């Protein structure tokens, strides 16, 4: 491509300050440095994590190019990059896999030591590894976000945060594999390890929660109870495999008590994809005594209280990061599984808009009217 080695001027949505609409601006994207790849973003989505970062309580750095769920095409590569070439279809992600560190070499985790280069692994990654940015606008340096920054027509990522995928992949669907689908689906398959014939409860029916429902279904769960305070999400949950749907606001007793009654003692597996203090407690309480397992997928609170009695009686709580998948190795396989119709991503996509309408996509999400909105340039 004629742009290799040159600064690219393109369109981006920049967050200049907290709690404000994103601004469509021209941005300059520098060429990739060593072990970096510059990507032309084809499709991206808005995830709640992107918008939560603009909350003043998060103390994010501004201005910043948000976005971390996308798919695109390699425009150019930096020195030392051997696994990618211009024209490759790729999916970037916030969970790196360097394949060299102690964590990457262990089969016990999907974390990577590269996360230690950043203040907080799933939120910041606000600069490249040399502690500089590849973005400028209006003569100001612009921060990166979660190692991806997909709200720009071109972005630069580390090769450890990138996977090459099938040349025939539909980028307007497999972009969901960059975060939301993979996190929820893997939470059920890899972390909870849902078993055939088991009973499951999934709290929160956004993209991650609905993907967890898909995972429970594929794992062979015989009962999948989906919980959300927005009943409009229930038809989609049932279409994806939920057997029961509960809205806590419609019940005359705590939802965990209702689940315990429905299942004759509690579910084998619960997955909290909402992450509030209330859902965390309910997700633990609704599991069966003796072996009940609660997997924490989303977390909007920094701390949770767990009864030691619950632990003594056999209940367990575990967390999951990127669905337990080793990212570089697993993302291409997930794309192949989608191509082979092992699961359907179409039901997770509720809207499609041009990138210029990104603030409309955010409004749809905040109003609970969308699961995922695909944005294209």
Swiss-Prot record:
One GO cellular component term noted in the UniProt record for this chain: cytosol
Tissue specificity as recorded in UniProt: Liver specific.
Cofactor(s) for this UniProt protein: Zn(2+)
SMART domains from the UniProt entry: PKS_ER (SM00829)
Keywords: Cytoplasm, Lipid metabolism, Metal-binding, NAD, Oxidoreductase, Zinc
TM regions (residue ranges): none
Co-factor: note: Binds 2 Zn(2+) ions per subunit.
Keyword set includes Cell division: no
UniProt note on regulation of activity: Oxidation of 20-HETE is inhibited by low concentrations of N-heptylformamide. Oxidation of 20-HETE is a decreased by 55-65% by either all-trans-retinol or all-trans-retinoic acid. Strongly inhibited by omega-hydroxy fatty acids.
A Pfam family this chain is assigned to: ADH_zinc_N
Main location per the UniProt record: cytoplasm
Cross-referenced InterPro entries: ADH-like_C, ADH-like_N, ADH_Zn_CS, GroES-like_sf, NAD(P)-bd_dom_sf, PKS_ER
Record EC number: 1.1.1.105
Protein residues bound to Zn(2+) 1: 47, 68, 179
One GO BP: aldehyde metabolic process
Subcellular location: Cytoplasm
One Gene Ontology MF term: S-(hydroxymethyl)glutathione dehydrogenase [NAD(P)+] activity
Subunit structure: Dimer.
Function: Catalyzes the NAD-dependent oxidation of either all-trans-retinol or 9-cis-retinol. Also oxidizes long chain omega-hydroxy fatty acids, such as 20-HETE, producing both the intermediate aldehyde, 20-oxoarachidonate and the end product, a dicarboxylic acid, (5Z,8Z,11Z,14Z)-eicosatetraenedioate. Also catalyzes the reduction of benzoquinones.
Family listed: Belongs to the zinc-containing alcohol dehydrogenase family. Class-II subfamily.
Official protein name in the record: All-trans-retinol dehydrogenase [NAD(+)] ADH4
Organism the protein comes from: Rattus norvegicus
Name of the gene this protein is made from: Adh4
């Amino acid at each position: 491509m004629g742009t290799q080695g040159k600064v690219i001027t393109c369109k981006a949505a920049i967050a200049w300050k907290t709690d404000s609409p994103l601004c469509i601006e021209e941005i300059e994207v520098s060429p990739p440095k060593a072990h970096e790849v510059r990507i032309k973003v084809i499709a991206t989505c808005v995830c709640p994590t992107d918008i939560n970062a603009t909350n003043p309580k998060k103390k994010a750095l501004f201005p910043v190019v948000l976005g971390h769920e996308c798919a695109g095409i390699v425009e150019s590569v930096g020195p030392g990059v051997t696994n990618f070439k211009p024209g490759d279809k790729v999916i970037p992600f916030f969970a790196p896999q360097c394949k060299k560190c102690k964590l990457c070499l262990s089969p016990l985790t999907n974390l990577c030591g590269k996360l230690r280069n950043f203040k907080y692994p799933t939120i910041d990654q606000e600069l490249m590894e040399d502690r500089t940015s590849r973005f400028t606008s209006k003569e100001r340096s612009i921060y990166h976000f979660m190692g991806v920054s997909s709200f720009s027509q071109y972005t630069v990522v580390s090769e450890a945060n990138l996977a090459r995928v099938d040349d025939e992949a539909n980028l307007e669907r497999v972009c969901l594999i960059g975060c939301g689908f993979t996190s929820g689906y893997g939470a059920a398959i890899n972390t909870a390890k849902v078993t055939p014939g088991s009973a499951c409860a999934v709290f929160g029916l956004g993209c991650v929660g609905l993907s967890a429902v898909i995972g429970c279904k594929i794992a062979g769960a015989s009962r999948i109870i989906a919980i959300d305070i927005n009943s409009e999400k229930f038809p989609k949950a049932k279409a994806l495999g939920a057997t029961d749907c509960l809205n806590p606001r419609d019940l005359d007793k705590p939802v965990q008590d209702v689940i315990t009654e429905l299942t004759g003692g509690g579910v084998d597996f619960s997955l909290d994809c909402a992450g509030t203090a209330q859902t965390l407690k309910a997700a633990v309480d609704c599991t069966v005594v003796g072996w009940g397992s609660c997997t924490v997928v989303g977390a909007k609170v920094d701390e949770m209280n767990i009864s030691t009695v619950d632990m003594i009686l056999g209940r367990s709580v575990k967390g999951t990061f990127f669905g337990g998948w080793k990212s570089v190795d697993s993302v291409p396989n997930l794309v192949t599984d989608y191509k082979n119709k092992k699961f359907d991503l179409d039901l997770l996509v509720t809207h499609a808009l041009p990138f210029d309408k990104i603030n409309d996509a955010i409004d749809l999400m905040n109003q609970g009217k969308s699961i995922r909105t695909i944005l294209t340039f």
